[in-house]
């Protein structure tokens, strides 16, 4: 019997790097909402009293970027007396956006391999490799450690926003360690929560008393509600439970650490449980395959698992800049597939169109901001881009595709042929 512990982490929306991801995606939303053909590569940096957006934009949209940035920072919770050195109203906002390189644009506008099909005309915005993953550990078909870490982080933000724990401040991190036996989760080994807070907590100022108070409150108002509907729940007697291990966490957010877009790519995806191609998502329009193809790879992997063709599936895609069709497609089922990896790969090539133009069209990636009141990508920028029951994400909706894959497998069995 194999037994091991796997750990994943998440961060709250007030973490400096996540502030940047949300600002970058708010810029993307605003531009696409006005001009769905906008080309965007927006990077954000924050530090004490400063937020700067930079990168490349080609768009007909007219956006008040300074006002937009301040609104995002304020919505997260950095405003007023509790802002702690990073206030939405008073922080400096710098805008340094240029136009996209025409050398890049020509390959995206007119793919090298197009042959009359309009979807062939949209080339990949860059070369690269992307991975998608799914497994049957949770209802959303995500690995349990990252799913739990996100649940805790979302709940931590919720009890701050609704005033349940009014001493909490925006910055925070969660981490969950899960025990596996024979590749199945059997026990929650450790829960770690680090959360920013006011210097005084419910009238307490002694560091140990403050820490104890926060620990008890978080177990009651964060851990228990976040795990209430799960079959595998933390046992306080046996689960190692750590809160603010350094003792206190008063100075946080951009006052404590600088933040950058794209520095939480493992939090954004599968918590390290699957491989990652290295490309970040936030601030990038759908022609950037770092984003759109990673969404498609998740869609493929989730459909394979939902169809019962594998208990675990990892899909690798690769692209060349200016070329529409993927350079390569590979499926790995880690021995859990009903058929071989080669047959699963053939099935994917037969049933999925993974050209950038087709991905963009299927998921309506250019129209999503305008279809959702001007805000879509920003909501993916915190608490993960995959396995989000709180969001209506098109790449998570695999019901019809899973049904067609099931039928294809049934037809194969009936005919006695390989896929």
UniProtKB/Swiss-Prot annotation:
<keyword id="KW-0067">ATP-binding</keyword>
<keyword id="KW-0963">Cytoplasm</keyword>
<protein>
    <recommendedName>
        <fullName>S-adenosylmethionine synthase</fullName>
        <ecNumber>2.5.1.6</ecNumber>
    </recommendedName>
</protein>
<keyword id="KW-0808">Transferase</keyword>
<dbReference type="InterPro" id="IPR022629">
    <property type="entry name" value="S-AdoMet_synt_central"/>
</dbReference>
<dbReference type="Pfam" id="PF00438">
    <property type="entry name" value="S-AdoMet_synt_N"/>
</dbReference>
<keyword id="KW-0547">Nucleotide-binding</keyword>
<dbReference type="Pfam" id="PF02773">
    <property type="entry name" value="S-AdoMet_synt_C"/>
</dbReference>
<keyword id="KW-0460">Magnesium</keyword>
<dbReference type="InterPro" id="IPR022631">
    <property type="entry name" value="ADOMET_SYNTHASE_CS"/>
</dbReference>
<comment type="subunit">
    <text>Homotetramer; dimer of dimers.</text>
</comment>
<keyword id="KW-0630">Potassium</keyword>
<feature type="binding site" description="in other chain">
    <location>
        <position position="288"/>
    </location>
    <ligand>
        <name>L-methionine</name>
    </ligand>
</feature>
<dbReference type="InterPro" id="IPR022630">
    <property type="entry name" value="S-AdoMet_synt_C"/>
</dbReference>
<feature type="binding site" description="in other chain">
    <location>
        <position position="56"/>
    </location>
    <ligand>
        <name>L-methionine</name>
    </ligand>
</feature>
<dbReference type="GO" id="GO:0006556">
    <property type="term" value="P:S-adenosylmethionine biosynthetic process"/>
</dbReference>
<feature type="binding site" description="in other chain">
    <location>
        <begin position="171"/>
        <end position="173"/>
    </location>
    <ligand>
        <name>ATP</name>
    </ligand>
</feature>
<feature type="region of interest" description="Flexible loop">
    <location>
        <begin position="100"/>
        <end position="110"/>
    </location>
</feature>
<comment type="function">
    <text>Catalyzes the formation of S-adenosylmethionine (AdoMet) from methionine and ATP. The overall synthetic reaction is composed of two sequential steps, AdoMet formation and the subsequent tripolyphosphate hydrolysis which occurs prior to release of AdoMet from the enzyme.</text>
</comment>
<comment type="similarity">
    <text>Belongs to the AdoMet synthase family.</text>
</comment>
<dbReference type="GO" id="GO:0005524">
    <property type="term" value="F:ATP binding"/>
</dbReference>
<feature type="binding site" description="in other chain">
    <location>
        <begin position="248"/>
        <end position="249"/>
    </location>
    <ligand>
        <name>ATP</name>
    </ligand>
</feature>
<keyword id="KW-0479">Metal-binding</keyword>
<dbReference type="InterPro" id="IPR022628">
    <property type="entry name" value="S-AdoMet_synt_N"/>
</dbReference>
<feature type="binding site" description="in other chain">
    <location>
        <position position="100"/>
    </location>
    <ligand>
        <name>L-methionine</name>
    </ligand>
</feature>
<dbReference type="GO" id="GO:0006730">
    <property type="term" value="P:one-carbon metabolic process"/>
</dbReference>
<feature type="binding site" description="in other chain">
    <location>
        <begin position="263"/>
        <end position="264"/>
    </location>
    <ligand>
        <name>ATP</name>
    </ligand>
</feature>
<dbReference type="InterPro" id="IPR002133">
    <property type="entry name" value="S-AdoMet_synthetase"/>
</dbReference>
<keyword id="KW-0554">One-carbon metabolism</keyword>
<dbReference type="GO" id="GO:0004478">
    <property type="term" value="F:methionine adenosyltransferase activity"/>
</dbReference>
<feature type="binding site" description="in other chain">
    <location>
        <position position="15"/>
    </location>
    <ligand>
        <name>ATP</name>
    </ligand>
</feature>
<feature type="binding site">
    <location>
        <position position="280"/>
    </location>
    <ligand>
        <name>ATP</name>
    </ligand>
</feature>
<dbReference type="GO" id="GO:0005737">
    <property type="term" value="C:cytoplasm"/>
</dbReference>
<feature type="binding site">
    <location>
        <position position="17"/>
    </location>
    <ligand>
        <name>Mg(2+)</name>
    </ligand>
</feature>
<feature type="binding site">
    <location>
        <position position="257"/>
    </location>
    <ligand>
        <name>L-methionine</name>
    </ligand>
</feature>
<dbReference type="InterPro" id="IPR022636">
    <property type="entry name" value="S-AdoMet_synthetase_sfam"/>
</dbReference>
<dbReference type="Pfam" id="PF02772">
    <property type="entry name" value="S-AdoMet_synt_M"/>
</dbReference>
<feature type="binding site">
    <location>
        <position position="257"/>
    </location>
    <ligand>
        <name>ATP</name>
    </ligand>
</feature>
<dbReference type="GO" id="GO:0000287">
    <property type="term" value="F:magnesium ion binding"/>
</dbReference>
<feature type="binding site">
    <location>
        <position position="284"/>
    </location>
    <ligand>
        <name>ATP</name>
    </ligand>
</feature>
<feature type="binding site">
    <location>
        <position position="43"/>
    </location>
    <ligand>
        <name>K(+)</name>
    </ligand>
</feature>
<comment type="pathway">
    <text>Amino-acid biosynthesis; S-adenosyl-L-methionine biosynthesis; S-adenosyl-L-methionine from L-methionine: step 1/1.</text>
</comment>
């Amino acid at each position: 019997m194999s037994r091991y512990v796997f750990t994943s982490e998440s961060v709250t929306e007030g973490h400096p790097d996540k502030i940047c991801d949300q600002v970058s995606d708010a810029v993307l939303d605003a531009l696409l909402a006005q001009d769905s053909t906008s080309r965007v590569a927006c990077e954000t940096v924050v530090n004490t009293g400063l937020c700067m957006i930079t990168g490349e934009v080609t768009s007909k949209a007219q956006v008040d970027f300074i006002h937009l940035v301040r609104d995002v920072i304020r919505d997260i919770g950095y405003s007023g007396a509790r802002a702690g050195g990073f206030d939405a109203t008073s922080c400096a906002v710098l805008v340094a956006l240029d136009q996209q390189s025409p050398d890049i644009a020509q390959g995206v506008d007119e793919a090298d391999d197009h042959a009359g099909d309009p979807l062939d005309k949209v080339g990949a915005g860059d070369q690269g490799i992307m991975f998608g993953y799914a497994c049957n550990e949770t209802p959303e078909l995500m690995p349990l450690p990252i799913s739990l870490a996100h649940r805790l982080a979302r709940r931590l933000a919720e009890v701050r926003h609704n005033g349940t724990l009014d001493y909490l401040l925006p910055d925070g991190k969660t981490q969950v360690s899960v025990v596996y036996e024979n590749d199945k989760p059997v026990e929650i080994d450790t829960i770690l929560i680090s959360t920013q807070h006011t210097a005084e907590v419910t009238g307490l100022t002694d560091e140990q008393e403050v820490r104890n108070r926060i620990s008890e409150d978080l177990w009651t108002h964060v851990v228990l509600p976040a795990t209430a509907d799960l079959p595998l729940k933390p046992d306080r007697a046996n689960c190692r439970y750590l809160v603010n291990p350094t003792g206190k966490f008063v100075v946080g957010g951009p006052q404590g650490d600088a933040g950058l877009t794209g520095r939480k790519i493992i939090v954004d995806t599968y918590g390290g449980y699957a491989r990652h191609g290295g490309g970040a998502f936030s601030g990038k329009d759908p022609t950037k395959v770092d984003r759109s193809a990673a969404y498609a790879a998740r869609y493929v992997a989730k459909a394979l698992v939902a169809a019962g063709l594998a208990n675990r599936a990892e899909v690798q895609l690769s692209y060349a800049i200016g070329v529409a069709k993927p350079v390569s497609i590979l499926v790995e089922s880690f021995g859990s597939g009903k058929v071989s990896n080669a047959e699963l790969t053939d099935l994917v090539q037969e049933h999925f169109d993974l050209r950038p133009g087709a991905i963009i069209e299927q998921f309506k990636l250019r129209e999503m901001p305008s279809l959702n009141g001007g805000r879509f990508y920003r909501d993916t920028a915190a608490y993960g881009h995959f396995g989000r029951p709180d969001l209506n994400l098109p790449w998570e909706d695999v019901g019809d595709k899973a049904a067609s894959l099931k039928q294809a497998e049934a037809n194969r069995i009936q005919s006695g042929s390989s896929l």
